[in-house]
Curated annotation (Swiss-Prot):
Belongs to the SlyX family. The gene is slyX. It holds the Pfam family SlyX. Gene3D superfamilies: 1.20.5.300. It comes from Brucella suis (strain ATCC 23445 / NCTC 10510). This is Protein SlyX homolog.
């Protein structure tokens, strides 16, 4: 394999790797959006659950654990 052929092969590999990195970056961005949406929904559901629990037993205060 000549030096020129090796250079072409390396350039092809770099181009393929750049494409893969771009694709992975896009997927990661979409996953973070999904995680953020799910986190917001979980917080809303947790708050709603605590409200309903308080309504069911109004004389017993419900507080979130310290790690919330």
């Amino acid at each position: 394999m000549s030096a020129e052929e090796r250079l072409i092969e390396l350039e092809i590999r770099v181009a393929e790797q750049e494409k893969t990195i771009d694709e992975l970056s896009s997927v990661l961005t979409e996953q973070w959006k999904t995680v953020d949406q799910l986190s917001k929904k979980l917080n809303a559901l947790t708050n709603r659950f605590l409200e309903l629990k308080e309504q069911a037993a109004p004389d017993v205060p419900v507080t979130k654990p310290p790690h919330w």
